[in-house]
Curated annotation (Swiss-Prot):
GO biological process: chromosome segregation; heterochromatin formation; mRNA transport; nuclear pore complex assembly; nucleocytoplasmic transport; protein import into nucleus; protein localization to nuclear inner membrane; RNA export from nucleus
Cysteine pairings via disulfide bonds: none
Pfam families, alphabetized: Nucleoporin_C, Nucleoporin_N
Name by which UniProt lists this protein: Nucleoporin NUP170
Residues modified as Phosphoserine: 1247
Species of the source: Saccharomyces cerevisiae (strain ATCC 204508 / S288c) (Baker's yeast)
Amino acid sequence: MFQSFFHNNGPAAAGETFSDSRSYPLTNHQEVPRNGLNELASSATKAQQQPTHILNSYPITGSNPLMRASAMGATSGSINPNMSNMNEHIRVSGMGTSKPLDLAGKYIDHLQHKDSNTPVLDERSYYNSGVDYNFSREKNGLGAFTPFEKQDVFNIPDEILHEFSTSQTKTDMGIFPELNRCWITIDNKLILWNINNDNEYQVVDDMKHTIQKVALVRPKPNTFVPAVKHLLLISTTMELFMFAISLDKATNELSVFNTHLSVPVQGIDVIDIVSHERSGRIFFAGQASGLNIWELHYSGSDDWFNSKCSKVCLTKSALLSLLPTNMLSQIPGVDFIQALFEDNSNGNGGFSQETITQLTIDQQRGIIYSLSSKSTIRAYVITEKSLEGPMSIEPAYISRIIGTTTARAAPILGPKYLKIVKISSVAPEENNNLFLVALTVGGVRLYFNGSMGRFNIEALRLESIKFPPSSVTPEVIQQELLHQQQEQAKRSFPFFSNLMSSEPVLLKFQKKSSVLLETTKASTIISPGIFFSAVIKSSQQTHQQEKKENSSVTGTTATAGSKTVKQQPVTLQHKLFVSVPDYGILKTHGKYVENATFLETAGPVQQIIPLSGLFNATTKPQGFANEFATQYTSETLRVAVLTSTSIEIYKYRTPDEIFEDLIDNPLPFVLNYGAAEACSTALFVTCKSNKSEKLRSNALTFLTMGIPGVVDIKPVYNRYSVSTVSSLLSKPTLSTATTNLQQSITGFSKPSPANKEDFDLDDVILSPRFYGIALLITRLLRDIWGRHVFMTFTDNRVTSHAFISSSDPITPSINNLKSDEISQNRNIISKVSISKDCIEYYLSSINILNEFFITYGDSISQISAPYVLANNSNGRVIDKTEEVANQAESIAINAMIKMVQSIKEGLSFLNVLYEESEVEGFDNQYLGFKDIISFVSLDVQKDLVKLDFKDLFAPNDKTKSLIREILLSIINRNITKGASIEYTATALQERCGSFCSASDILGFRAIEHLRRAKEIGLRNYDSLNYHLKNATALLEQIVDDLSIEKLKEAVSMMLSVNYYPKSIEFLLNIANSMDKGKLACQYVANGFLENDDRKQYYDKRILVYDLVFDTLIKVDELAEKKQSSKTQNQISISNDDEVKLRQKSYEAALKYNDRLFHYHMYDWLVSQNREEKLLDIETPFILPYLMEKAGSSLKISNILWVYYSRRSKFFESAEILYRLATSNFDITLFERIEFLSRANGFCNSVSPLSQKQRIVQLASRIQDACEVAGIQGDILSLVYTDARIDSAIKDELIKTLDGKILSTSELFNDFAVPLSYHEIALFIFKIADFRDHEVIMAKWDELFQSLRMEFNNTGKKEDSMNFINLLSNVLIKIGKNVQDSEFIFPIFELFPIVCNFFYETLPKEHIVSGSIVSIFITAGVSFNKMYYILKELIETSDSDNSVFNKEMTWLIHEWYKSDRKFRDIISYNDIIHLKEYKIDNDPIEKYVKNSGNNLGICFYKE
């Protein structure tokens, strides 16, 4: 099923060398005669004046231009001591700091990316000047570089050949590689011959008429039973029959079923049948149907209107499709008239009806191409029910385009030879631009690009041309070069300056090449770009063509009649030509070269078809043709060539086979493909166990030492090295090929000067040896490296096929998996993504690599240093850069060796998983996999399906943890089957130790103790205690490897036997063992820094603490049950015992000396709304916790002041309350005022004498805050009822006011002034002790003006009284609050203002005496103070003071009524007779003068 990694699939071809007399094609850069190595070396000697003894000791075999150019440019000494280092270098940072597996993984990632982004195979720029062929006319003449070798020959049985030769009408033959059968038609009989068994063949002879065409197609989906994978279509002269084919691949037994489906095709003469695999649609064309394309319809149902099988013409109307196909051609004279309008440039002198000769389909783009008998190509887009088009390409168009290119005037593309014999589509994966390749009768390949719209082809254009190789001799090449040099010299003269430059010699000779003349329709192109040409030549024709090509190009060509030559007998020669792009040269040097030669064949070729899958490396043009990337994982390409008597199997020669043939001199391989590829192949050959010891030894010698004196393989320090990864996407050009080659030859990559004290391992260019090792590992695993390890039930895109391209990663659809489906299956994972056979294949290959590294790993990783010392015979001081380079090399190679070991363990794990999934009696069904995965939690399964093979092979801690879950599942399953944990775990550790360490073994033993404890329950306390103690002790030993999931599982088993207090103690011990250095506490103390490495210890502790809290929740729930628990695993206990169990559990937690745990436990209680429990806790940590958390938690602050008050610490309680009232917490203003009130109450409580002064200061601050809060509350009330404010603004103001207590400045500037709350402003003046008289009086004026604006003067007394009441209320309210401040409430100034305000605003008759003075008295001003203020106003008034007199009169009368003492000193008569106050009749003044005392009256002036 799989190609063996370290075994050759066929015999190696004998080593061959090239003859120096053979002709060599020319490169595009240097036109020199190619007469072999000796001449090149001598010419180089003349130019350089340097000896060539080194090159002569290593003769170069082959005619590859790169090898010859390299030889020519070499000088004495070693050829590039650092050959290809620069080209292969990948700079990976962290060489000295990365973990080995991480470092190796980075290199594999980069190399995979590089392999997947190599150049596109066919670009126009590659061969504008002709194709650079490495060509030999001799059969298998390229020696080691011959692309194909004959592997086997299957002769057609004699009885079939005899019957074939006695056919009466028509015979045909072909190959069905899908069935491993050869088909042969003889008249009306079809024979299916088993290629692998000469005596096994089947005959289908149900047809009555001669068979015209046979085809094998895939059926439409859901039409036949699943066993039917193919349909056999047999077209006769009358009908087209359909047979169902079933093939048992295990036994190779073929079954043919007659479906009884057929359709009449009389008059069509079917010539070709093709199918569109995506839709299953079948198309065909016929010689008698002109240019029409038909479609065959079939179904599994038959009704009144539609038959099961029918045909429809897709290229003409329904009416015309009803007429006989050849009716038009039967009309006399039609052919002659048609011929008048046709191009007769082919010179055949006649005319014929144009018909289709071939159909082909571009399966990806959905285009069907037809080739006509007149070499016209037509393209149609396959739509749902029809064909859109056509887009036509005619020979005239091709000739016109050729005339505008360098291919103009090419004899091989003249009218006589511009006949297309075969067309092949180019898949978009191979080339996005190219659509089609057409082969001409002269062996020219015409490449067409195109563009598509949504439902049509927008354009098909001739893009490039590949001419066949030329067979000219070196003498002719030399003659042409001399001629071009003469022409070049002429151009230096003015007269010749306008002459056009001559075309390249290579192109000039290829344009008239006759090597592939008479190419037949059996020729083909096999992706990617492999050209097979079946050629028919006569011996006379071959001789004449060679003579013509080798004739002088400078003079006139020789005419056929110049000499009379004796005619030789004419014999036909059947040749098989193959030309394969050398992709190794293209990706290494950016130069396009094709290896071309003739292969041995026994007779006329009937068909050429690939038997195995192609070696496409990606699904995109970049990297598609990279055969080096897939050489270890893809099946070797085999091509079947069907002749008239046999089937010849040709096998593509892989790089390792080329290297084996060149083992005595691998220099050509190095020059072509680079030293890294050579080292990779050498390592591969070294590991082949079926090769000779000498061959493997030579390969190992090259891997370790290179070619001494010619190719040194060692690392180099270069500070300015640039990684090739950054330029992967740049397109190599021919202009860069020579430059890169010269750099390789002359040793361009030299150590850069560096500071001796400053060396970076990242600047080392590692040796090709390392890259060879890395490439082999990368390519071996390329198909699975980025692929998911496991599949889900919903992922149907993955099959169990061994290899799937890494460019199309598999992504499990976890989110699409329905919950009911998960619950039904109890699993997300369905299976491993690769089969057991595939795992064993990889494992066997990795084991061989691992054994190689065990034997040679130490010497290879340290080979550079000994090599330097061994070659340091001249006493040279070893440069520090060499030491650094060797150190980096050793690190990198050791990383790869460790990666191989890790891959081995990862694959071993998967192998164990398959083995454990085996169920006896059900081989290869792995029914136990579902049971194993069922032990894994769904959360872990979700992580497992995201796991790539890359993660498995270079596992981090998380990956190892996930794999351990599966290993634990295997152990659990074995436990259920009665197996021993010890035995199973030990076996797992031996096979995949990195996933099953010694700690895991201890963990498994602990789980075993817990399992037994659970089984015992509470029936036997001593045994139970024994197992639980042992389990906890074992788990505490492996605390560093104990995952939180395992810890949960262990605790769950402990709690099932009521092991609550000890479980809590165990968990807290685990938490402290995880963090023995108390790093978590340091992390907290330093403020939870974001990039602090100690955070991981903190996180671990928190996870364990959460388990403690979960345990406490469970014990709380247990205690709250009223009735005893009677579950199977728990003993019945009374409710009192449950309460005691909870009490002991909490005691175990609270007595544990762990500050961090206590803090988190208190946080947990608060989060559970059980903060009141904190008031009852007496631990050393509770008060510090409350004090620390109070500043950031409102709940904790409330708890703290209650905590203090319960312990009679009233000052501390008041202080906390004051802080709360002034804090930034989200507290309403009312609550803040309440806090202040409580705080004030605590200040008035009994407290120690030492706190008296502090309490007084605190009480003062509280009082100030209360006053401000009161004003803020007044503003809030006004805002609530203020209709002037917009609702949105009002909400914002309310939100601001109903929160934090603001400052007086904020209240004044942001609220009182903008909202014109004048009375509030006066209140703020008072509490702020503001004394600016002018500002204060201005605010009073604003207040009076605002009141005046509210008065509606209608002249009615009622309105006047309302206004008086309004004014009175405002002044009384203000006065009561500020009257004790003479600055804010200056009565001497306010009284006249109020009087003027009254009398200016209201009618005098509405003003009652005493209305004004009563306002001040009600506001709290005393009578005697008011008396002296009025008296002074009267005495100092310059104007009419009648208003003051009236108010004084009312004041004295009211004083008399209200004050008993006043009545005692003033006589009633004085009051009765006081009608109008004057200074002269003032009773108070009279009393003072008479008595000489003031009777204790406090005078205002004082």
